[in-house]
Regions:
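Rossmann-like NAD(P)(H) cofactor-binding subdomain of soluble oxidoreductases
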Residues: 15, 35-39, 44, 50-125
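Short pre-catalytic strand/loop immediately N-terminal to key active-site residues, enriched for Gly-Thr
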Residues: 109, 158-163, 215-219
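NAD(P)+-binding Rossmann beta1-loop-alpha1 motif at the extreme N-terminus of oxidoreductases
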Residues: 1-50, 122, 184-185
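NAD(P)-dependent Rossmann-like dehydrogenase/reductase catalytic/cofactor-binding core
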Residues: 198-258
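Non-catalytic terminal and connector segments of soluble metabolic enzymes
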Residues: 4-6, 23, 48-50, 55-58, ...
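Internal alpha-helical scaffold of NAD(P)-dependent oxidoreductase catalytic cores
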Residues: 98-108, 124-160, 172-210, 255
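Small-residue helix-packing motif on alpha-helices
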Residues: 28, 38, 55, 71, ...
Length: 258
């Protein structure tokens, strides 16, 4: 497939890298007003351009990774030169209905929420679409399944998916940073503490994904009566570990909804 990404910021570039590294037979073009920061993508075979219309007529999927205020300007630029395209939008707050109205009935709107782990083939990309666009949306699902997982969700949960899957990357990194800081306090240099903390989180996630079980069941395997693990867990909960994370996620969602 030919994939055209408009918006070569962190997210757009991450998607391009992921497609280049983890999928086969796909040609990628990325556009950005200033391409200096994404020229390195050319080393992966990605075409880089300042022109949003460059190669767009050959595109099977057009991905929008731009700011909400840029949508109308970008669409006014590209719509006159394209026909019957699948347009996948990662624009926060832009509903499928709104996008479909903007692009017209000859195009198919799909809503996506990837994250920057796309470049490592480890994104959780939530996807929503109208039933009438199911066939076109399947192309998008197949593409993003190559960059991690691509669960199909109800569009009403897309704002929540933004927080859980996209903002969630930052929340997970904040936990790793805190674990690293604790590692330094108990004797490790920061590099070793970071390596141990990151690998431990990766291992925990792999166990969950492979065994498809509840986290508490895996926690039970690690904890022993009167052991150090349960003592640490209880101390963290005493100071609001779980509740503070839940509050943070809910606060982020409120920010999106205004």
């Amino acid at each position: 497939m030919n994939v055209h990404i408009i918006g070569g910021g962190n997210l757009g570039a991450s998607i391009a890298i992921g497609i280049a590294k983890f999928t086969e037979g796909n040609q990628v073009t990325v556009t950005r007003r200033n391409t200096k920061s994404i020229l390195h993508l050319e080393q992966l075979g990605v075409t880089v351009s300042t022109d949003n219309k460059h190669n767009i007529q050959e595109a099977d999927i057009i991905i929008l990774t731009i700011k909400p205020y840029q949508v109308d300007t970008v669409l006014a630029e590209i719509l006159p030169v394209i026909a019957n395209k699948t347009i996948a939008s990662a624009v926060s707050g832009l509903s499928i209905e709104n996008l479909q109205n903007k692009i017209g009935a000859t195009h198919q709107a799909v809503r996506i929420m990837p994250n920057i782990a796309s470049q490592f083939g480890a994104s959780a990309t939530c996807i929503a679409f109208q039933e009438s666009n199911k066939e076109a949306a399947q192309k998008v699902v197949t593409l993003f399944e190559g960059l991690g997982t691509a669960p199909i969700i109800d569009e009403k949960l897309m704002d929540a998916a933004t927080v859980l899957a996209a903002s969630g990357t930052a929340f997970a990194l904040r936990y790793i940073r805190a674990s690293m800081q604790a590692g330094i306090e108990i004797g490790f240099d920061w590099q070793t503490a970071l390596a141990i903390s990151a690998q431990t989180v990766k291992g925990a996630a792999e166990m969950l994904l492979e065994e498809k079980t509840h986290p508490e069941q895996l926690i039970d395997r690690v904890t022993t009566p009167q052991g150090c693990t349960i003592a640490g867990l209880n101390e963290m909960e005493l100071h609001g570990f779980s509740s503070s994370l839940i509050r943070g996620i809910k606060t982020s969602l409120k920010q999106i909804k205004g």
